[in-house]
């Protein structure tokens, strides 16, 4: 019998499952090397915690790791039902709020090691969390892709910790009662990008699609389709970072000015950025709430101990 201890939270409605104990020893290398070991040798632990019957396609997992830098508060490896993420904004907010709930950190700024670089996260007195993300940038502007049933679609390719294709002019109604259509549209766009060889820098896969619309309560509302075909309930921290990079590149948002990004369900992040040469350093602020603490059991006699794989 294998057991895994977890602490679940949600950030703006998007769940994070923090793995506290039970995963194999991944060594003492940097976080990226440990992610590689996990994916190549122990991926069944990811599947057990993310896939049904213990997980679902909305969950993002966060494996708590001992950091390399003694000044860091934590290291983290993010993953979901389909694989691994470089960075996760809502997940980092969930991580910090969870560590505070456990009494492991106090109010203040904390260094967090991720597979794509270090980020700073500040736990505020009101329990909200600000994440100073990895450098973000727009890779290409106004990229055209021919999409089956929809014709020519134009969007920007940007990095915010993951690769995004950001679409402003899409002709879709961005509303919570239109999720099936939004999912179908965004998934078709993603398939077209792959089929036509449109990628991020160095051929990296664009695995997030982000649609934007106006909003009465925020500067913008988005719909974000994640790699596993589930939509993001939060405004998406890395997606908001990619959006900020595009706004900065177009001269539509000045450094330090606040941008309020709403999600498809109405939750919000507050974002701003600092200019750093050709990059921007986004800061995303949001709140996370604890939802469950549990121990997962993987019984060797259970045919679905390591998840249902369809």
Curated annotation (Swiss-Prot):
Gene3D superfamilies: Diaminopimelate Epimerase, Chain A, domain 1 (3.10.310.10). It catalyses: trans-4-hydroxy-L-proline = cis-4-hydroxy-D-proline. The keyword rRNA processing does not apply. Its EC number is 5.1.1.8. The active site is at residues 88, 236. Substrate binds at residues 89-90, 208, 232, 237-238. Keywords: Isomerase. It comes from the Bacteria. One of its GO terms (molecular function) is 4-hydroxyproline epimerase activity. Belongs to the proline racemase family. Catalyzes the epimerization of trans-4-hydroxy-L-proline (t4LHyp) to cis-4-hydroxy-D-proline (c4DHyp). Is likely involved in a degradation pathway that converts t4LHyp to alpha-ketoglutarate. Displays no proline racemase activity. PANTHER family: TRANS-3-HYDROXY-L-PROLINE DEHYDRATASE. This is 4-hydroxyproline 2-epimerase. It comes from Acinetobacter baumannii (strain AYE).
């Amino acid at each position: 019998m294998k057991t895994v201890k977890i602490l679940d939270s949600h950030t703006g409605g998007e769940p994070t499952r923090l793995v506290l104990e039970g995963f194999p020893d991944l060594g003492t290398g940097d976080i990226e090397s440990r992610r590689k070991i996990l994916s190549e040798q122990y991926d069944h632990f990811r599947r057990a915690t993310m896939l049904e019957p213990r997980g679902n396609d909305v969950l993002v997992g966060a494996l708590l790791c001992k950091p390399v830098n003694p000044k860091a508060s934590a290291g983290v490896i993010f993953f979901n039902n389909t694989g691994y993420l470089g960075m996760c904004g809502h997940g980092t907010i969930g991580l910090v709020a969870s560590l505070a709930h456990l009494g492991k950190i106090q109010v203040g700024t904390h260094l967090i090691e991720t597979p794509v670089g270090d980020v700073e996260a500040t736990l505020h007195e009101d329990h909200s969390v600000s994440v100073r993300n990895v450098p973000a940038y727009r890779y290409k502007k106004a990229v055209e892709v021919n999409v089956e049933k929809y014709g020519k679609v134009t969007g920007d390719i940007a990095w915010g910790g993951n690769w995004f294709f950001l679409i402003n002019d899409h002709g879709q109604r961005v509303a919570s009662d239109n999720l099936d259509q939004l999912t179908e549209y965004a998934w078709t766009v993603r398939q077209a990008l792959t089929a036509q060889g449109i990628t991020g820098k160095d051929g990296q896969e664009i695995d997030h699609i982000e649609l934007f619309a106006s909003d009465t309560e925020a500067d913008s509302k988005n719909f974000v389709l994640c790699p596993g075909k589930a939509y993001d309930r939060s405004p998406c921290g890395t997606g908001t970072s990619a959006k900020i990079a595009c706004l900065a590149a177009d001269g539509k948002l000045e450094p330090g000015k606040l941008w309020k990004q709403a999600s498809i369900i109405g939750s919000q992040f507050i974002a701003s950025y600092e200019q750093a040469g050709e990059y921007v350093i986004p800061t995303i602020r949001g709140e996370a709430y604890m939802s469950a603490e549990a121990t997962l059991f993987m019984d060797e006699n259970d045919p679905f101990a390591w998840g249902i794989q369809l």
